[in-house]
């Protein structure tokens, strides 16, 4: 069973946490992680790109010249695609790029990235993150006490940590999520994970 050090908010060590090997100790599947990251990045795309075809371009309702007798090629509109200022053919239309992967694939990717963080020593467990009020300075002290210098993903329990979330919201390189909402993309994008002990239990309940 994998073990990680458990810290208090002030940075002092409070003991160790034993992790479930079926969640935090598997052989990472990099191919599955790649597929899930691509899927989640695709879901973030707005997909609002658009073009104007010949029917959407303003003007062009009048036939530019009569059908026969001019010696020119027949034309029905000055907004045909071959005209300057005409419509676009086969241009982009608004669409959703999102696509879903099977649940087992997504769960395997989560277990893979969690296991990688544990193996690399980049998962920091903290017994609790309790704040009497939303204070950015107080959360900054926690980050400093735990010697976290680069981008960190803070994983809170699913409920009851509103002050912690508000306290971290304005800190640079700090992103906050919950046990059920942590995504593979968020985890691989962060240098370290700061996970509350109760959130670890909730993660194991879902993925084990």
Curated annotation (Swiss-Prot):
Gene Ontology terms: biological process: translation
Location of the region described as Disordered in the Swiss-Prot/TrEMBL record: 45-89
GO MF assignments: rRNA binding; structural constituent of ribosome
Role played: One of the primary rRNA binding proteins, this protein initially binds near the 5'-end of the 23S rRNA. It is important during the early stages of 50S assembly. It makes multiple contacts with different domains of the 23S rRNA in the assembled 50S subunit and ribosome. Forms part of the polypeptide exit tunnel.
Xref: PANTHER family: 50S RIBOSOMAL PROTEIN L4, LARGE RIBOSOMAL SUBUNIT PROTEIN UL4M
Assembly mode: Part of the 50S ribosomal subunit.
Full protein name: Large ribosomal subunit protein uL4
């Amino acid at each position: 069973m994998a073990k990680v050090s458990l810290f208090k908010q002030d940075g002092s060590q409070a003991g160790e946490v034993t992790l479930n090997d079926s969640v935090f100790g598997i052989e990472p599947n990099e191919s599955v992680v790649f597929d899930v990251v691509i899927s989640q990045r695709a879901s973030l795309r707005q997909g609002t790109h658009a073009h104007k075809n010949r029917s959407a371009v303003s003007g062009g309702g009048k036939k530019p010249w009569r059908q026969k007798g001019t010696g020119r090629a027949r034309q029905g509109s000055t907004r045909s695609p071959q005209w300057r200022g005409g419509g676009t053919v086969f241009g982009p239309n608004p669409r959703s790029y999102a696509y879903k992967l099977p649940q087992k694939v997504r769960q395997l990717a989560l277990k893979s990235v969690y296991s990688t963080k544990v193996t690399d020593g980049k998962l920091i467990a903290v017994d609790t993150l309790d704040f009497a009020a939303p204070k950015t300075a107080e959360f900054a002290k926690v980050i400093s006490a735990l010697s976290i210098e680069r981008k960190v993903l803070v994983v809170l329990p699913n409920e009851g940590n509103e002050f912690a979330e508000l306290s971290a919201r304005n800190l640079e390189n700090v992103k906050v999520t919950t046990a059920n909402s942590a995504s593979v993309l968020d985890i691989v994008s962060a240098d370290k994970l700061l996970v509350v002990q109760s959130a670890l239990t909730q993660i194991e309940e879902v993925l084990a």
